Amino acid sequence: MHPSLYITGAGVSAESGIPTFRGQDGFWTIGSANYTPQQMATRAMYMQRPAEFLLWYYRRFAQYRHLQPNRVHRWLADKKLITQNIDGLDGKAGNVDYIPIHGRLDKVTVLHDQGAEVELLDAPWQQVADNQDAPNDDGHLKTALLDAFRISSTTQTPQMNQSLKPFVLLFDEYYTELYRMSVAQNWLLSATKMVFIGTSFSVGITDIALQCALQNNAPVHIVDPDPVDLGVDGIHYHRMTAAEFIASQ
């Protein structure tokens, strides 16, 4: 059996300055229409409107790539950890074998059929930054992004096995081995205790994890200032921030 397994969400990285992008702050405007993160973060949006998708991804995530881990990341550095966050801060904090189950901001892949074996490549964010004539001009930024991601600015159609796609699990995609899903399932099934920190239980991995814990009678702890009531008996709720929780341990 593995020791305690920690499963983290956006609440852990908030102290580092990364917004959670839920609620009003998460809306994105294209023309006169507002889109939610659930509408923007889709494979369909990437395929149909790659310039808008990449601009959204850059503004909402890539521009925070230089931020540093906080005390919670450092506390988790020697823990068995699955994170929903793509910011890579757990790796920066020194956790050498954590699972970024939704991908990593600093990596991309070639566009491929889901489930195919592909190599992780370094994300071309610096190339994008270097090629911006006017950093605050969305038009120039879109051109730089399309070029860096190998997408024709004329056709604006991503090409299979040629164009690049951010290494991120989108809402209309599913978990594959690219995201180390088999290893994650092994950890979930063999955990003696699960501690969820800063997650709203709004994505698939948290539901899978909770079911594994209940199946194995593993204690479940939820750390959140305003936790979601899961309606399950026996769950230990810690109504506090992640920083307050680690200070109490």
Region locations from a protein language model:
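Conserved catalytic core of sirtuin-type NAD+-dependent deacylases
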Residues: 1-249
